[in-house]
Amino acid sequence: MKDFGSERVTEPPGTIPSMAWKLDNSREIGDKEMRVGLRAIKLEWDNFNQICSSCHYTESKIKARIEEITAKRGKLQNPYTQSSGVLYGVVDEVGTLWEGEDFKEGDSVISLTSTAGLPVH
């Protein structure tokens, strides 16, 4: 817990994930990580509104903009509002340090952590 995901930070070095410009969002996980298959993301209102208005409320453009943000930053954090959202998903893989805990692959999860600090692929 002491690193708090800092090994995923690529820009700028030495920052925590939620403050970083870019995260490593590769699919391989470390011993203390888990990979969650996204089922839904609830964007914060400012984030959602800014993306929608900049895309003229066109669904295909909104989807493309979200994909562009995650490809560029490795996480879903709007570069204009600095806001993000929370996610719902299913555990796909668990790192070895989590073995024996109260969750397993296939469990549903809702993050209490903003997607600003989570790698999104």
Language model features by range: what are they?
Residues 1-9:
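A eukaryote-biased signal for short, well-structured alpha-helical docking elements
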Residues 13-25:
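Short glycine/threonine/proline-enriched tight-turn/helix- or strand-capping micro-motif at secondary-structure
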Residues 27-42, 54-115:
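Glycine-rich beta-strand-centered segment in the early N-terminal region that forms part
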Residues 47-48, 115-121:
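Short, Lys/Arg- and Gly-enriched loop/turn segments at beta-strand edges
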